Amino acid sequence: MAVQRTLLVVKPDGVERGLIGEVVSRVERKGLKIVAMKMMRLTREKAEEFYSVHRDKPFFGELVEFITSGPVVAMVVEGDEAVSVVRLMIGSTDGRKAAPGTIRGDFSLDIMKNIVHASDSPESFEREFRVLFSESEIVEW
C-alpha cells in the first residue's frame, strides 16, 4: 500500500449545514490523518484556478459562483491509498446517485451542492494543493 495525500474540501453547503464535524469524524474513523486544515473564502480567481480543468464545460460559471458563495473548509488527508479511499467515502458526484453510507449519499440530493470535493487522482491533488495550500502548512505527525 502506498501512503498518499489527497485534498478534501467541505463546500459552502456543507459548511452552512454544519457538516464540518461530520466530515472530519468520518475521515478520522476511517483511520486517515488530517495533516493540514483551514477555513477560507475562495476568491473568484482562486476558484477559477482550482476548477480550471472544467473551464470549457457549460457548468463552469455556476460552479465558480457556488464555490465562492460562502466559506469552505479545506483539508489535506494522508493515509494508505488516500485518494481512492476518500473518493469511495464521499460517493458519487451526483448526490441522488450516491450510495447510502457515503457523505454525499447521506447528505446530498444535488450534483452541485454535494457537500464535498475530493481530488480524483494524485496528479489532481498536486495541482489543487498548490492553489489552496503551501508546503509550510503541512503538519507531520
From Swiss-Prot:
Main location: cytoplasm
GO cellular component: cytoplasm
Gene Ontology BP terms: CTP biosynthetic process; GTP biosynthetic process; UTP biosynthetic process
Record's keyword annotation contains Metal-binding: yes
Reaction(s) this enzyme catalyzes, per UniProt: a 2'-deoxyribonucleoside 5'-diphosphate + ATP = a 2'-deoxyribonucleoside 5'-triphosphate + ADP; a ribonucleoside 5'-diphosphate + ATP = a ribonucleoside 5'-triphosphate + ADP
Disulphide linkage map: none
A single GO molecular function term of this UniProt record: metal ion binding
Active site positions, chain numbering: H117 (pros-phosphohistidine intermediate)
Protein keywords: ATP-binding, Cytoplasm, Kinase, Magnesium, Metal-binding, Nucleotide metabolism, Nucleotide-binding, Phosphoprotein, Transferase
Compartments it resides in: Cytoplasm
Pfam families reported in the protein's UniProt record: NDK (PF00334)
UniProt entry tagged with the keyword Isomerase: no
Requisite cofactors: Mg(2+)
Protein family according to the UniProt entry: Belongs to the NDK family.
NCBIfam families documented for this protein: PRK00668.1
Protein name, as recorded: Nucleoside diphosphate kinase
